[in-house]
């Protein structure tokens, strides 16, 4: 039998794909977006940006911005019973409302 690969993007055929109208590069304002510490953000992975991409397990999660590391933001997310710190570029983060 063939052995299954265990890469970073495995089992993400639907999760890391764009709809035809969304294809192409992201707006530049999304890369220049700034977040303040303590702000709530949603992790929505943009598959066209490979740098600063969090693990697909955290796609759709909501967390709190803890700090900044270079161009990326550190987001505190609850995973099971633990809190984990995710390092992600602003292209993969959206401000949470309400």
UniProtKB/Swiss-Prot annotation:
Q: Which superkingdom heads the taxonomic lineage of this protein's source?
A: Archaea
Q: Name one GO molecular function term.
A: structural constituent of ribosome
Q: Which residues form a coiled coil?
A: none
PROSITE patterns for this protein: RIBOSOMAL_L21E
Question: Which terms does the UniProt entry file under GO BP?
Answer: translation
Biased composition, class Basic residues, residue ranges: 10-21
Give me the ranges of the annotated region Disordered.
1-22
Query: What are the record keywords, sorted?
Result: Ribonucleoprotein, Ribosomal protein
GO CC: one term?
A: cytosolic large ribosomal subunit
Q: Which Cys-Cys disulphide bridges does the record give?
A: none
Question: What family is this?
Answer: Belongs to the eukaryotic ribosomal protein eL21 family.
By what name is this protein known? Answer: Large ribosomal subunit protein eL21
Species of provenance: Methanocaldococcus jannaschii (strain ATCC 43067 / DSM 2661 / JAL-1 / JCM 10045 / NBRC 100440)
């Amino acid at each position: 039998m063939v052995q299954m690969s265990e890469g970073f993007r495995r089992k993400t055929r639907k999760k890391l794909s764009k709809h035809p109208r969304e294809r192409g590069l992201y707006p530049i304002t999304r890369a220049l977006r700034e977040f303040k510490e303590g702000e709530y953000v949603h992790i929505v992975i943009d598959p066209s940006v490979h740098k600063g991409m969090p693990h697909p397990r955290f796609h759709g999660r909501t967390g709190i911005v803890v700090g900044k590391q270079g161009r990326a933001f550190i987001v505190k997310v609850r995973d099971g019973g633990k809190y984990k710190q995710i390092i992600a570029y602003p292209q993969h983060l959206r401000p949470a409302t309400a």
